[in-house]
């Protein structure tokens, strides 16, 4: 591991390899490159001190460098212990940007690195958060509540919370008042994923959101592209790299049929698997059925499945009882943000054999084995390299626009959760059309007037679902 005073990466000598892949990724990320072209001279993020917690991949490296081109100072950590691409982290560290990310972190390292993205050399706080899953945001908010005397650290509900709470106590002892000062300095947060957005809406509902937030996840050019088309390519990539199993003809169960579930089901079906879907929402269940998938319960389907993948953002989706029913060598994995979709903790007293990084064989007392990918964490990033650059360009362009909006127009927003306006969503899509050779039809003035829009858009109402 290579560590300096202000970065921690696996091996800084990987920087040259990372830079070569960054150069390729830039050609596949037209939205971010257009943002550099449009905003580079005006420096809208000059003065922004961004704490970023998002998978430290090659694509994220392009995002980081875009934020810097726009004037921001950045400190970065990964939002998942397995998702870092070490050569990407090295490439960013080599430019002088503080990054704290290693593939295969311990939980203690993870929360130490999350703390480090708020530790600036001058001792002053961050003023923006760019988050994926909400861990960076929750670290500051829970810490501030603890400093205010609330009893929020005495009853951890999981191993991860034990480590998180210990890190908060450590920071409170080292820097009294740190969390309260940091919370007050934040102008806003932009949140990448469904899980983190749910956390923000819960805070808003309780009146506990202390700064504005932009829900990047529910931009159409994020959720309908990254969540669907990204998973469509990266899920099967992760299963293949992890297991080398042939999916054609196998029975695969996808738990959940939201945007991630839809992409995952299509991914497995495209590989030739016979896909079944579980759902709690009757609308999503009907969509799955009419897309040609059998809608089942996991109680009924567990015993016949060869592959089971969770996509829900909920907890305890695959229980220990489900796993007891599964056949020998069933592959179990998750593509939702957190590892609690699968009851991995309930497997810890069984026999574990590590096959290779992020692939474990779990043996039950009766001799039956399961193949668990990435210890129940995001398998597309743990076992593979995540979504392709092109689809991440759309997501990350939304992040850049959200950061600019909250940093430059802070007073225009209340302490609530917002989505980017429709015209910016359409702008992000427009920036990606040329790369695919797509040409837009242009409405005449008469046609536009007939449907009540302008020829330049926006073309749909805010509630249109796409």
From Swiss-Prot:
Its EC number is 3.13.2.1. Coiled coil: none annotated. Gene3D superfamilies: Adenosylhomocysteinase-like, NAD(P)-binding Rossmann-like Domain. Pathway: Amino-acid biosynthesis; L-homocysteine biosynthesis; L-homocysteine from S-adenosyl-L-homocysteine: step 1/1. The lineage of its organism: Bacteria, Pseudomonadati, Pseudomonadota, Alphaproteobacteria, Hyphomicrobiales. It holds the Pfam family AdoHcyase. GO terms for biological process: L-homocysteine biosynthetic process; one-carbon metabolic process; S-adenosylmethionine cycle. InterPro entries: Adenosylhomocyst_ase-like_sf, Adenosylhomocysteinase-like, Ado_hCys_hydrolase_NAD-bd, NAD(P)-bd_dom_sf, S-Ado-L-homoCys_hydrolase_CS. This is Adenosylhomocysteinase. GO terms for cellular component: cytosol. Belongs to the adenosylhomocysteinase family. May play a key role in the regulation of the intracellular concentration of adenosylhomocysteine. It is an enzyme of class 3 (hydrolase). Its cofactor is NAD(+). NAD(+) binds at residues 193-195, 227, 256-261, 279, 314, 335-337, 380. Its main location: cytoplasm. It comes from Brucella ovis (strain ATCC 25840 / 63/290 / NCTC 10512). It is found in: Cytoplasm. PANTHER family: ADENOSYLHOMOCYSTEINASE. One of its GO terms (molecular function) is adenosylhomocysteinase activity. It catalyses: S-adenosyl-L-homocysteine + H2O = L-homocysteine + adenosine. Substrate binds at residues 57, 132, 192, 222, 226. Keywords: Cytoplasm, Hydrolase, NAD, One-carbon metabolism.
């Amino acid at each position: 591991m290579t560590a300096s005073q202000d970065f921690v990466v696996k091996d800084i000598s990987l920087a040259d390899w990372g830079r070569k892949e960054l150069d390729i990724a830039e050609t596949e990320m037209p939205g971010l490159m257009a943002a550099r072209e449009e905003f580079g001279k005006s420096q809208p993020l000059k003065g922004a001190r961004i704490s970023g917690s998002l998978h430290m991949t090659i694509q994220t490296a392009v995002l980081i460098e875009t934020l810097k081109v726009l004037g921001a100072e950045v400190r970065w950590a990964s939002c998942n212990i397995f998702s870092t691409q070490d050569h990407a982290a090295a490439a960013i560290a080599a430019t002088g940007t503080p990054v704290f990310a290693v593939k295969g972190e311990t939980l203690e390292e993870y929360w130490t690195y999350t703390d480090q993205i708020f530790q600036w050399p001058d001792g002053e706080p961050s003023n923006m958060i760019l988050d994926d899953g909400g861990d960076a945001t929750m670290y500051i908010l829970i810490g501030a509540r603890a400093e205010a005397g609330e009893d929020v650290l005495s009853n951890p509900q999981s191993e991860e919370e034990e480590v998180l709470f210990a890190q908060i106590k450590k920071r409170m002892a080292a820097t009294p008042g740190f969390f309260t000062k940091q919370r007050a300095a934040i102008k806003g947060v932009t949140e990448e994923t469904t899980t983190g957005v749910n956390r923000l809406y819960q805070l808003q509902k309780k009146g506990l959101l202390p700064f504005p937030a932009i829900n990047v996840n529910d931009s159409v050019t994020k959720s309908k592209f990254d969540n669907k088309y990204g998973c469509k390519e990266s899920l099967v990539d992760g299963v293949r790299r992890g297991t080398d199993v042939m999916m054609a003809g196998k029975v695969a169960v996808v738990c959940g049929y939201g945007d991630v579930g839809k992409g995952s089901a299509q991914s497995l079906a495209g590989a030739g698997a016979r896909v079944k879907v579980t759902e709690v929402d009757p609308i999503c269940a009907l969509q799955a059925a009419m897309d040609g998938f059998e809608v089942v319960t996991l109680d009924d389907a567990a015993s016949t499945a060869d592959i089971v993948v969770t996509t829900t953002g909920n907890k305890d989706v695959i229980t220990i009882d489900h796993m007891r029913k599964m056949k020998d060598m069933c592959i179990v994995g998750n593509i939702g943000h957190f590892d609690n979709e699968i009851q991995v903790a309930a497997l810890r007293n069984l026999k574990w054999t590590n096959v290779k990084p992020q692939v474990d064989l779990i043996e039950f007392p009766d001799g039956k084995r399961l193949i668990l990918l990435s210890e129940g964490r995001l398998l597309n990033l743990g076992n593979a390299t995540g979504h392709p650059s092109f689809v991440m360009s759309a997501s990350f362009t939304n992040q850049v626009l959200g950061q600019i909006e909250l940093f430059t127009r802070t007073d225009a927003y209340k302490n609530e959760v917002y989505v980017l306006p429709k015209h910016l969503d359409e702008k992000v899509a427009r920036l990606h059309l040329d790369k695919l050779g797509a040409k837009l039809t242009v409405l005449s003035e008469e046609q536009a007037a007939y449907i009540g829009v302008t020829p330049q858009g926006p073309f749909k109402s805010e509630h249109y679902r796409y």
